[in-house]
């Protein structure tokens, strides 16, 4: 869930994931939304991760005017809860961070890593190409061993960001599909709001494929994502692996 964790809830999200899985589209979810304390399916973040197979981590907004502006202590505590629960559950649960435009950038994460013995892999910040200062933080975070997500618009512009990473296996690309986007006036009022189309992801892959080739372009959308989420036997075309393919009218597979 995103901004709206009030009229929408984790129960509905869980039900939709279960429906998709029954239709042979493997679906996983994150508990929580932009806000803190985390809205959960059970009584706690730990129970959600330990007892519900399809929950692979927690969602939270950082450095965004719509976030709860979690304190350093609260962030360390939440990360520790996720860490402990993932060890018990045998998962690679992470804290997926919606990153906003505020100047703090990834500083809350850097502070948490300095204060506690938390693996850098537990944090996965998204929208990291939305402004120059956040992208600079993202490059630093990746050099520390962390993974980052770039949001695509379907126009191939992520290539210029990808080129700046020393290790591209640390990068995933997503579309924020069916999520809301918004722009604001100087006084903070909403200027425009809309929905990000699912098609952006496919358009971005085709654009990158034309520049980089299949083998280099595909992992950002598949293998790297599976690695971040700790999903085994998926993310690549290999004997014994689960693979989802879409066939186009001309016989091409995506």
Spans of features found by a protein language model:
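Active-site core of metal-dependent hydrolases
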Residues: 66-67, 74, 80-184, 190-194
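His/Asp/Glu-enriched, well-ordered alpha-helical/loop segment
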Residues: 166-248
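Short, Lys/Arg- and Gly-enriched loop/turn segments at beta-strand edges
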Residues: 251-254
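Active-site loop-helix segments enriched in His/Asp/Glu that coordinate
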Residues: 1-85, 99, 108, 112
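Electropositive phosphate-/nucleotide-binding environments in soluble metabolic enzymes
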Residues: 10-14, 69-72, 76, 103, ...
């Amino acid at each position: 869930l995103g901004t709206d964790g009030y009229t929408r809830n984790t129960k509905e999200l869980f039900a939709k994931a279960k429906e998709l899985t029954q239709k042979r589209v493997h679906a996983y979810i994150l508990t929580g939304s932009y806000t803190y304390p985390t809205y959960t399916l059970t009584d706690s973040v730990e129970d959600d991760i330990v007892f519900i197979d399809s929950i692979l981590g927690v969602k939270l907004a950082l450095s965004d005017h719509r976030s709860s502006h979690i304190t350093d202590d609260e962030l360390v505590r939440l990360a520790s809860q996720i860490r402990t629960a993932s060890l018990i559950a045998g998962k690679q649960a992470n804290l997926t961070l919606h990153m906003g435009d505020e100047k703090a950038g990834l500083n809350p994460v850097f502070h948490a890593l300095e204060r506690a013995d938390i693996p850098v892999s537990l944090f996965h910040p998204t929208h990291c190409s939305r402004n120059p200062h956040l992208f600079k933080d993202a490059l630093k975070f990746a050099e520390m061993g962390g993974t980052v997500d770039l949001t695509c618009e379907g126009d191939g512009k992520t290539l210029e960001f990808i080129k700046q990473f020393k290790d591209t296996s640390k990068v995933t690309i997503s579309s924020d599909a069916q999520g809301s986007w918004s722009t604001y006036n100087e006084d903070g009022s909403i200027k425009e709001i809309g929905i990000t189309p699912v098609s952006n992801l496919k358009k971005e892959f085709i654009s990158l494929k034309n520049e980089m080739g299949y083998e280099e372009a595909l992992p950002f959308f598949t293998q790297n994502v599976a690695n971040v989420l700790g999903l085994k036997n998926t993310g690549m075309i290999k004997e014994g692996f689960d693979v989802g393919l879409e066939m186009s009218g001309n016989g091409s597979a995506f």
